[in-house]
């Protein structure tokens, strides 16, 4: 079963709503110390289930959530990318979290580009942010490649309120001007 929502495609990737079959991927992402370092830290499979369920629930309640990210060539789940704005979040975010073996391939930038286009065109967002830990230089580089600028420190809601986070972002107009 797949949560309600659209499927997006890029040259190499499929972005679709969360499906029950994604649990192994979510658990691998949550269980790897490097992959999970900046997305809440290592979590057991039961917490990966909760995170996956939160994504599916957000699709049902808000009409958006991070997409499950699949390689087109293999159909393999490689991460989650897309719009995210839970209660108390500092803004309309497009975020990403990829399995370690999917790093360095340009997937985060490619998928986030499709997700930002969708958020601006279909959700009517006027601004997008990316919440990034200052020491997460690879994600800061993705934000730069997307055309976002460092906006400054932001506070996330509990239980993440003790983590130093910086917002990167841009307006819909800035995004569209850059995409022409």
Can you annotate each of these PLM segments?
Residues 1-38, 53, 66-180:
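Acyl-donor (CoA/ACP) binding surface of acyl/acetyltransferases
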Residues 44-63:
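Active-site rim helix/loop that mediates acceptor-substrate recognition in acyltransferases
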């Amino acid at each position: 079963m797949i949560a309600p929502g659209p499927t997006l495609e890029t040259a190499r990737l499929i972005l679709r709503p969360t499906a029950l079959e994604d649990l192994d991927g979510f658990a691998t992402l949550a269980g790897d110390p490097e992959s999970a370092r900046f997305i809440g830290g290592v979590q057991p499979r039961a917490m990966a289930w909760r995170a996956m369920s939160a994504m599916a629930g957000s699709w049902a309640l808000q009409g958006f959530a991070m997409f499950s990210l699949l390689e087109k060539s293999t159909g393999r789940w490689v991460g989650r990318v897309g719009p995210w704005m839970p209660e108390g979040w500092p803004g309309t975010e497009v975020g990403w979290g990829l399995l370690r073996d999917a790093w360095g391939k340009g997937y985060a930038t490619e998928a986030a580009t499709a997700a930002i286009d969708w958020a601006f065109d279909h959700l009517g967002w006027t601004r997008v942010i990316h919440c990034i830990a200052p020491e997460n230089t690879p994600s800061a580089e993705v934000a730069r490649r997307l055309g976002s600028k460092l906006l400054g420190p932001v506070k996330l809601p509990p239980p993440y309120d003790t983590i130093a986070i910086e917002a990167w972002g841009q307006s819909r107009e800035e995004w569209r001007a850059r995409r022409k």
